[in-house]
């Protein structure tokens, strides 16, 4: 086997950056920079007569984004029985999906979803403030409009099918008695539908996030002091990365996702650094 190009993808986008000096006085200044970018891609052609190629939880389909999701639609848990439910998504004579609900997984059909891994917008917001000898800089990064499939969960959301495997902590909220409204099925040995063997939209999550990416506070020693000992400039600082994050889905880090799939990725680490800059 060998790698080769089997299609054409068209990308187009726009990027905007705005910088401003909000305040500027002798002793105090405040500067802001905001940027946002949007990129959209679309598969134009595939090899030969092909119009689509299915690949796990995604599909390469002409006219769609490169990482468009393709899977069975989860329809919740039956509140009376605790069994998982799915939309059948049969197609009527007009080409529309029929949203009947079934507990039989073999009657549910995977469909092309209007969701993709690529975010609609990414960007950042940074501010720098200075007052006499002190400076403060902080930057937020953000991302909106993308999705990821939780492959970690597919390995552990077995509902009792594998009693020797790890179990996610959220299974404590699984169905237990008639009337319970929950996203997680009755947990018992050898269930009729082993959810770890089924790719469904229950594990499809937004990757929207806002993160305090960097925060730095510094103090520059007045030159009247440093020049007395033959030093031109001394700056002390403390810097931190990834101190705070808001995420639409917070069970895993949205930046630990690769290609629309959450599996084995390492999230950005929280770090704190102290330092000194000296110029002679």
Segments the model singles out, each with a brief description of its role:
Residues 32-34, 138, 236-238, 276:
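Membrane-embedded beta-strand positions of outer-membrane beta-barrel proteins
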Residues 3-11, 56-83, 174-180, 245-280:
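C-terminal beta-signal and terminal closure region of outer-membrane beta-barrel proteins
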Residues 20-22, 36-42, 131-133, 142-146, ...:
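Transmembrane beta-strands of outer-membrane beta-barrel pores
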Residues 26, 133-138, 224-225:
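Repeated loop/turn-to-beta-strand initiation elements of outer-membrane beta-barrel proteins
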Residues 10-14, 36-42, 118-123, 142-144, ...:
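Transmembrane beta-barrel architecture of outer-membrane proteins
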Residues 143-236, 240:
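Extracytoplasmic gating/loop element in the C-terminal half of outer-membrane beta-barrel translocons
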Residues 30, 41-57, 145-175, 246-254:
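Outer-membrane beta-barrel and related beta-rich outer-membrane complex signature
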Residues 4-10, 14, 21-117, 157:
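Conserved small-residue
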């Amino acid at each position: 086997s060998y790698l080769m190009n089997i299609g054409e993808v068209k990308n187009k986008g726009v990027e905007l950056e705005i910088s401003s000096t909000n305040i500027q006085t002798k002793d105090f200044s405040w500067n802001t920079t905001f940027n946002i970018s949007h990129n959209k891609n679309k598969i134009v052609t595939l090899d030969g007569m092909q119009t689509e190629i299915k690949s796990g939880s995604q599909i390469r389909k002409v006219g769609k984004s490169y990482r468009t999701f393709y899977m069975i639609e989860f329809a919740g848990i039956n509140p009376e029985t605790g069994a998982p439910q799915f939309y059948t998504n049969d197609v009527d004579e007009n080409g529309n999906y029929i949203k009947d609900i079934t507990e039989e997984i073999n009657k549910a059909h995977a469909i092309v979803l209007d969701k993709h891994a690529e975010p609609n917008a990414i960007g950042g917001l940074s501010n720098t403030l200075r007052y006499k000898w002190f400076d403060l800089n902080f930057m937020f990064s953000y991302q909106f409009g993308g999705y990821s499939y939780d492959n970690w969960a597919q390995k552990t959301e077995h509902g009792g099918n594998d009693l020797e495997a790890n179990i996610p902590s959220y299974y404590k909220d699984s169905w237990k008695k008639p009337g319970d409204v929950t996203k997680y099925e009755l947990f018992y040995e050898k269930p009729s539908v082993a959810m770890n063997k089924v790719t469904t939209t229950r594990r499809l999550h937004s990757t929207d996030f806002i993160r305090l990416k960097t925060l730095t506070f510094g103090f520059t020693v007045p030159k009247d002091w440093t020049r007395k000992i033959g030093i031109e400039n001394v700056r002390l600082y403390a810097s931190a990365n990834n101190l705070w994050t808001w995420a639409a889905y917070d069970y895993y880090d949205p930046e630990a996702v690769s290609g629309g799939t959450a599996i084995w990725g390492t999230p950005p680490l929280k770090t704190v650094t102290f330092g000194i800059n000296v110029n002679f």
